[in-house]
Structure formats: structure tokens, C-alpha cells
Amino acid sequence: MLPKPLFDLALKLQYFPGVGVRSSQKLALDLLELEPDKYGELLEALSSVRAQIKFCAQCGFFAEEGAASGLCDICRDARRKPKQICLVEKPTDVLTVEKSEIFKGHYHVLENLISPLDNVFAEHTTLGALVERIKTLLDTPGATVELILFFKAGFSGEATTAYLKDLLSERGLEERVTITRLAQGLPMYYNPDTLDQATMVRALEDRREV
């Protein structure tokens, strides 16, 4: 039986996805055995992350507090293609696409996928902000935008895609926006976190128009 402070720490470490009872207890004991200076460095790093990491004002990926215009490194990178946007469900999915090392566009984090059965609707996503972003990109005559879907293709994914198409149609943007999905070789309910680099490269290169 762990002393209460250790037990409480182990319990709170289970807030992290995938951390169960045994692994949380091991982590708690590992923290207890850290040298004082390393323990202090860890606490400082945790505090710094909470204070200094925000979400990009344009795409929703991680950005550093005080960054120019509130944008992340990707959105500020002039070498990337702003009219090629990869749609992801959560910020960590950006890291999965980036490890392909071939995607040079921008991103847009949806935060949620539409799922009426789970009481998740369009207002719980950033689709509205995405459409406004697209309108700005299309201000230039003849400009086009490609949206690359990188989220699961189950019911919630299809509902999100359908709503996005409706929004684009309502705004008269559908003729200038191409929507593509990653290669059909991916499992329908794939977990973005588990995709390796080779799989990501093939999926991006073989993407198909929706």
C-alpha cells in the first residue's frame, strides 16, 4: 500500500491517456527517486509549458506565447503552401503528418468531428473558421484551395465531410476548392498516432478527390 501522497500522485498520473494503475505507480516512484535538481527542472518545464504554449490563432496547432501574430511556426513559414490545407481532428495529428517530411502545406485543427449521437455538432468544431480562412485565400482571382482530409472515415468523419461540403456550397466556394482524402489503403478506423513514416508518405502521394 502506497503512502497517501504517492497514491494521490499515481492516481493523477492516470489522467494521461494509456497510463493505467501499474504504470502510474511506477512513474510516481520514479519521480520520487529523481535527484532534487532534476525534479526541480521537471517542475519548471511543466510550469513553462502551461504558461508559454498556446494554440495558433490561424490553424489551432501549438504555438509559443508571444509569437508573431499568435501564429505557430508552420503558419509563419513562408516556404510552405497556404492554399494546401490538411484538416486534422486534434493538434497532435499534425505531428503525424509532419513525420512524412513531404507535406509542405498548412493545417487546420477541427477540435472535434461532428457526431450527433454523441451530441457533437458543427458549433463544436472550427469548420466555420476554416471557411472564413478559405474565403480570404480565394480573394486572389483564379486562386484555388486544396483541403486534405486526415481524420477517421467512420460516421463522424463522413458527417463532418458532408457538412463541410454544404458550407462551401452555401458560400459559392465549391468550384474553387478541391477536397481530397488520404489513400484508401488506410484502415477505416485508423489511429493517426500509430501511422509510420512510410505509410504516411504513400497515403499522401496516393490521395484521392472526394
Protein language model annotation of sequence segments:
Residues 5-11, 33-57, 69:
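Short Cys/His-rich Zn2+-coordinating modules
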Residues 45-94:
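Cys/His-rich short segments
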Residues 2, 103-104, 131-138, 144-210:
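Long C-terminal interaction/binding lobes of large macromolecular proteins
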Residues 17, 36, 49, 61, ...:
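Conserved phosphate/pyrophosphate-binding and hydrolysis machinery centered on Walker-type P-loop NTPases
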Residues 14, 32, 47, 64, ...:
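Signal for well-folded cores of large energy- and translation-related assemblies
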Residues 24, 77-151:
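Extended interfacial segments that mediate partner engagement and assembly in macromolecular machines
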Residues 1-17, 29:
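Extended, structured, electrostatic nucleic-acid-contact surfaces
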